[in-house]
Every structure is written in structure tokens, then in C-alpha cells.
UniProtKB/Swiss-Prot annotation:
<dbReference type="InterPro" id="IPR005117">
    <property type="entry name" value="NiRdtase/SiRdtase_haem-b_fer"/>
</dbReference>
<dbReference type="InterPro" id="IPR006067">
    <property type="entry name" value="NO2/SO3_Rdtase_4Fe4S_dom"/>
</dbReference>
<dbReference type="GO" id="GO:0005507">
    <property type="term" value="F:copper ion binding"/>
</dbReference>
<dbReference type="InterPro" id="IPR045854">
    <property type="entry name" value="NO2/SO3_Rdtase_4Fe4S_sf"/>
</dbReference>
<dbReference type="GO" id="GO:0019418">
    <property type="term" value="P:sulfide oxidation"/>
</dbReference>
<dbReference type="GO" id="GO:0003677">
    <property type="term" value="F:DNA binding"/>
</dbReference>
<dbReference type="GO" id="GO:0016002">
    <property type="term" value="F:sulfite reductase activity"/>
</dbReference>
<dbReference type="GO" id="GO:0009570">
    <property type="term" value="C:chloroplast stroma"/>
</dbReference>
<comment type="function">
    <text>DNA-binding protein that binds to both double-stranded and single-stranded DNA without significant sequence specificity to reversibly repress the transcriptional activity of chloroplast nucleoids by promoting DNA compaction and possibly regulate DNA replication.</text>
</comment>
<keyword id="KW-0560">Oxidoreductase</keyword>
<dbReference type="GO" id="GO:0006790">
    <property type="term" value="P:sulfur compound metabolic process"/>
</dbReference>
<dbReference type="GO" id="GO:0010319">
    <property type="term" value="C:stromule"/>
</dbReference>
<feature type="transit peptide" description="Chloroplast">
    <location>
        <begin position="1"/>
        <end position="61"/>
    </location>
</feature>
<dbReference type="Pfam" id="PF03460">
    <property type="entry name" value="NIR_SIR_ferr"/>
</dbReference>
<dbReference type="GO" id="GO:0005886">
    <property type="term" value="C:plasma membrane"/>
</dbReference>
<protein>
    <recommendedName>
        <fullName>Assimilatory sulfite reductase (ferredoxin), chloroplastic</fullName>
        <ecNumber>1.8.7.1</ecNumber>
    </recommendedName>
</protein>
<keyword id="KW-0238">DNA-binding</keyword>
Length: 642
């Protein structure tokens, strides 16, 4: 796994003097309580089973051989996955009970199916359980039929709202257990999926939501689709559970099938229904984003893998720069956990991208820690090993050397709000949605427009929505009806709101410590009032992100001003991100009560206005000044009239 979590002799990856990697035999797959499925490990090496195979028996992990007595223990989730018969048991039994909830093992497994069990934390008495469903939409693409289906499901089986997420998907809250199969099957039968939207596997693959008819944008979105297909589970557990085994999958591109099946460098589990994942899947969640030069709408460096299209002087895509090791989650006051930006690993030709991505995923699969989930993301493996060692190991699975990264221009955050020409005679319209929550008159009007004009939509990584393929003659009536529902053009939306994000937090998220989505409207109004008080112009802005806990779902550690839940009605304040999302923030103050935000922020905004350099953003200013000086400015601040 990692440098502190070793496989047994004969199965471990071994570094020789010249740093080559020897992928040895997987020995001794034995367990007193489980059965190994099949007769082969990685690369087709025979492995003796401890008992005869049985499709109904718990399954020994192909990728995790039985450990000797001295081996590091595995987390309980690893044991649950091992015994689940490829993410089926005991979820399949729990769904049939009369109880409104499922047991602990099933809670972990249903994540792989795209759902979290929740309850309303503000209700007293017994817990009223429900389930949140999350769709999987590579590049944020939502066909017209799927949007209308999700809109219907929210009203009939949810809480009457849809939520657009920071990974370009829908979240549907409030689904009762008894309705799960109906809702899931409806999504599947209407061009959607929730498979892998949660759980220890590749999540939704991001790409710019703009439907430009440009070679690099189209290629980025095609690549995102192909990576999503490559890393999608193959064992059928999802369709078995929700549509009785009926397959609703489109034909995969041949290059995806070829890359998945290729085992030239010992990446696959031979004869396993999960050739890439095995029975243990990945140690933790895994996130991928694809984009084009300059377009950082996807928060590229926060992903486990970031992929950037590189084109020649004629605009023809030639290959990709790849970044590895980003991730946001951390734990308060536990310095061994941290947010981290991805770093360059190299360049690959366009025909090799699926093989390179697969090699990176397999490196994490084989070496990521499985004993302590706090340290199981790939960022900790790379931080432990260093990028050079990580690259060496990946290259053994890739079968080639990475080329030097190509030089790229500066990044920009692109929101795609407002009207834009697609390049094919049609238009697209980006609409700001506060915290991604679509409800009320906004929801009703969006449905009417999308249904009337048969529009496909896309979800952005900033929780907004894009209406696609709009004819010129439709622009005026669509603009008018949207404005009447509060879906305004960007010139009428506060610049602070346009870049702000928040996670759902209370009342349904089990990890929330304090408010986020429900708290951010007031926070943004107070920041605007502070701007006015210190003399900052209306068109000036600061990237503000709010989360209810330190797990970082709204990527607060990239914000210029990040507020991270740190107790009831209090936040940890983070400063130092940049508007183009290329610099990570740092923790500035702990446990700042929400009613004390003016005491902290107003002096900083005031001195930023007075002391900033030309075009210096708030995040750049706070980094240049340093935290010691900033705290001094807060302590000595006597108001605007000083």
C-alpha cells in the first residue's frame, strides 16, 4: 500500500538498485472466514484458493492477499468490501427489510451505488431516515430526458428541490428506503446513472461545462467520458440491484475496452469481474478532472488526477499534461491530515491517456493505505513517497516514461454565466444558482423552458447550470421568463455570489458541525456591507467558500476567504487562495464565531483597499502581508474613520 503499509513477502513491490519495480506473485490468499473467487491473481499467476468458490459466499480480495501475523490491520470498510460479493451483500438483504434504514455494512456499500443514508438532525425523538442520491454526469452533461426525470423525482420522492453539486452532478435528497428502487430504476431508464457517484472508486469526471464547438473543448469532454467509462465498475452489481440485472449501457468506444482489458504490465485481475478494481476497489474516493489550457472552471489542482489537453499550433490536440495528488479533505487540528494541490507528473501522447490514467489508479490501488481511512487518499501516498518515486512506480504499470510537461499559459476561472455563442450558430446560457439549490419558482420555470425548447443542460463545477443549443430567436423569450423567476443575467448578480460556494451541511449531512448552505446568504450580504463600509467598489469581489465541516466538499481551501465549520456557529478562517484557483489557502484563525466575522474581515478588507498593489487580489494580498501582520492589523483596527 503506502511506504508504511506493506504487502507480504512475495506480493510486495520491490525496489531494486536501479529503482525498477518487480511485480511478484500474490502468495497465500488464505482466510479463515472468506473464499477467494477464481484461481488467478494479477497477471494470470495461479493462486490457490482456501476453499471452493461460491457466488453466494463472501469473497476474498484479489488485490489484498491475506496478511501474516505482523501485517498492519485493515479498516472495517475494507472487511465489509471483502465480504460483500462485489458490493452486493448485505445491501441486497437490507433493502428488503421493513426497517426505514439499512445496517452499517449496507451503509458503506450503498455509497458505491450512489447513495448516502441520512436523517434529519434537527428533528427530536426517533431518527427519520432517508437517502440522498447522487447522479454521475461526466462533463456535467444532462440530456433533456434525464433533467425532466430528475425534476419529477424530486417532487414525487424527494424534498421538492434538486441540488447541483461541485462535481457537476445532481443530488436528490429525502428519498425513503421503500422508494429507492423506483427512483434508481427511473434514473437508469432515462439516460442517467448513480453508479460510482460515491464510494471507494472513481467519482464523476469533471470537464468544462461550456458546449463550445472547439476542438480542444470537444476533445476534453470526450476524454472525460472515456476516463469515466474506463473506470466504471464492470461486475454488474449496480444493475443487479436496481433493474434486476437488465443492462442500460451504451456501447463503449473500442479504445476504452482495449485499455481496460490490456494487462501488458500487470495492472489487471485476470478472470475477475472487476479487472481494475478487484474485490477491494480503491482505498478511498478518487477524483479526476479534464480541461483545456487557461480554463480552470474545474478546480483542476484539487483532483487526484488533473488532465490538460495540449494542442499544436493548428489547434489539433496532441496529448496531455497530467497532474497528480490533489485533495481537499482534512481533520481539524490534526496536522498529519491536510489539503494538497496536485503537481505535474509529466506529458503523454493523446493515444496513451487511458493507459496512463489506469497506471496511476492501479498505483493507488496497490499502495494507498487501507488501514486508516484518514490517510487513504492518493495525496498521502505521494506526500510520503515524493513525486519521483511515485512516477517511477506508475511508469512500471504504464510501460513507458512520462515526457516532460508542456508549458501552459496562466489559468483563469471561467464561470460561463450569461449568453455565449457555441460556434455552431447556436447559443448557450449560463445561469447562477445560489449554492446549487434549484427549487420553488426557479425550478418550475427551468422545467418549463427546458421542456418547451427540448434543451439539454450541463452542470458546472461551481454549482450553476448551462442551457445548451439555443437558437437565436429563442434568446429574448427565454431571458425574459428566466428573469421573472430570479434567474438573472450575470450583470444583475452580485459578484460575490457568482464565485461563492457552500456545501449542504445542516440539517441532513451527518458530518456537519455548523451551517453552510443555509448560512452563506447572510454571510455574503454581510461581506457586501463590509465592502461598502470600507469603500470597495461593487464590481470587486473575493472568492468565498463555506463548508459545515473540514472535509472540504465545496473546496474551501482554494478560496480567498474560506470558512470551515469548526464548532456550533463558528468557523475556522482560511486565507490566501487566488481567483484563478491555483494557490492553496492556509488556516488563519480557529473557532471564529459567525457573529464575529466583521471583527476579523472588516480590517482586512480595509487594509487591502489601502495597501494592495496593482490588480492584487485579496488572496494575494493576505499572502504577501503574512498572518502575523494581518493579526496585528485586526488588533489595532479602529474603524474606517481612523
Amino acid at each position: 500500500m503506502s511506504s508504511t503499509f506493506r504487502a507480504p513477502a512475495g506480493a510486495a513491490t520491490v525496489f531494486t538498485a536501479d529503482q525498477k519495480i518487480r511485480l511478484g506473485r500474490l502468495d497465500a490468499l488464505r482466510s479463515s472466514h472468506s473464499v477467494f473467487l477464481g484461481r488467478y491473481g494479477r497477471g494470470g499467476v495461479p493462486v490457490p484458493p482456501s476453499a471452493s468458490s461460491s457466488s453466494s459466499s463472501p469473497i476474498q480480495a484479489v488485490s489484498t492477499p491475506a496478511k501474516p501475523e505482523t501485517a498492519t490491520k485493515r479498516s472495517k470498510v475494507e472487511i465489509i468490501k471483502e465480504k460483500s460479493n462485489f458490493i452486493r451483500y448485505p445491501l441486497n438483504e437490507e433493502l428488503l427489510t421493513e426497517a426505514p434504514n439499512v445496517n452499517e455494512s449496507a451503509v458503506q456499500l450503498i455509497k458505491f451505488h450512489g447513495s448516502y443514508q441520512q436523517y434529519n438532525r434537527e428533528e427530536r425523538g426517533g431518527r427519520s431516515y432517508s437517502f440522498m442520491l447522487r447522479t454521475k454526469n461526466p462533463s456535467g452533461k444532462v440530456p433533456n430526458q434525464l433533467y425532466l426525470t430528475m425534476d419529477d423525482l424530486a417532487d414525487e420522492f424527494g424534498i421538492g428541490t434538486l441540488r447541483l453539486t461541485t462535481r457537476q452532478t445532481f443530488q436528490l435528497h429525502g428519498v425513503l428506503k421503500q422508494n429507492l428502487k423506483t427512483v434508481m430504476s427511473s434514473i437508469i431508464k432515462n439516460m442517467g446513472s448513480t453508479l460510482g457517484a460515491c464510494g471507494d472508486l472513481n467519482r464523476n469526471v469533471l470537464a468544462p461545462a461550456a458546449p463550445y464547438v472547439k476542438k480542444d473543448y470537444l476533445f476534453a469532454q470526450e476524454t472525460a467520458d472515456n476516463i469515466a467509462a474506463l473506470l466504471s465498475p464492470q461486475s454488474g452489481f449496480y444493475y443487479d440491484m436496481w433493474v434486476d440485472g437488465e443492462q442500460f449501457m451504451t456501447a463503449e468506444p473500442p479504445e476504452v475496452v482495449k485499455a481496460r482489458n490490456d494487462n501488458s504490465h500487470g495492472t489487471n485481475f485476470v478472470d475477475s469481474p472487476e479487472p481494475i478494481y478487484g474485490t477491494q476497489f480503491l482505498p478511498r474516493k478518487f477524483k479526476v478532472a479534464v480541461t483545456v489550457p487557461t480554463d480552470n472552471s474545474v478546480d483542476l489542482l484539487t483532483n487526484d488526477i488533473g488532465v490538460v489537453v495540449v494542442s499544436d499550433e493548428n489547434g489539433e490536440p496532441q496529448g496531455f499534461n497530467i497532474y497528480v495528488g490533489g485533495g481537499m479533505g482534512r481533520t481539524h487540528r490534526m496536522e498529519s491530515t491536510f489539503a494538497r494541490l496536485a503537481e505535474p507528473i509529466g506529458y503523454v501522447p493523446k493515444e496513451d491517456i487511458l493507459y496512463a490514467v489506469k497506471a496511476i489508479v492501479v498505483t493507488q490501488r496497490e499502495h494507498g493505505r487501507r488501514d486508516d481511512r484518514k490517510y487513504s487518499r492518493m495525496k498521502y501516498l505521494i506526500s510520503s513517497w515524493g513525486i519521483e518515486k511515485f512516477r517511477d512506480v506508475v511508469e512500471q504499470y504504464y510501460g513507458k516514461k512520462f515526457e516532460p510537461s508542456r508549458e501552459l499559459p496562466e489559468w483563469e476561472f471561467k464561470s460561463y454565466l450569461g449568453w455565449h455563442e457555441q460556434g455552431d450558430g447556436a447559443w448557450f446560457c449560463g445561469l447562477h444558482v445560489d449554492s446549487g439549490r434549484v427549487g420553488g419558482i426557479m425550478k418550475k420555470t427551468l422545467r418549463e423552458v427546458i421542456e418547451k425548447y427540448k434543451i439539454d443542460v450541463r452542470i458546472t463545477p461551481n454549482q450553476n447550470i448551462v442551457l445548451c443549443d439555443i437558437k437565436t430567436e429563442w434568446k429574448r423569450p427565454i431571458t425574459t421568463v428566466l428573469a421573472q423567476a430570479g434567474l438573472l443575467q450575470p450583470e444583475f448578480v452580485d459578484p460575490l455570489n457568482q464565485t461563492a460556494m457552500a456545501c449542504p451541511a445542516f440539517p441532513l449531512c451527518p458530518l456537519a458541525i455548523t451551517e453552510a448552505e443555509r448560512g452563506i446568504p447572510s454571510i455574503l450580504k454581510r461581506v457586501r456591507a463590509m465592502f461598502e463600509k470600507v469603500g470597495l467598489d461593487y464590481d470587486e469581489s473575493v472568492v468565498i467558500r463555506v463548508t459545515g465541516c473540514p472535509n472540504g466538499c465545496a473546496r474551501p481551501y482554494m478560496a480567498e476567504l474560506g470558512l470551515v465549520g469548526d464548532g456550533p456557529n463558528s468557523y475556522q478562517v482560511w486565507l490566501g487562495g487566488t481567483p484563478n484557483l491555483t494557490q492553496i489557502a492556509r488556516s488563519f484563525m480557529d473557532k471564529v464565531k459567525v457573529h464575529d466575522l466583521e471583527k476579523v474581515c472588516e480590517p482586512l478588507f480595509y487594509h487591502w483597499k489601502l495597501e494592495r498593489q496593482t490588480k492584487e487580489s485579496f488572496g494575494e494580498y493576505t499572502t504577501r502581508m503574512g498572518f502575523e501582520k494581518l493579526k496585528e492589523l485586526i488588533d489595532t483596527y479602529k474603524g474606517v474613520s481612523q
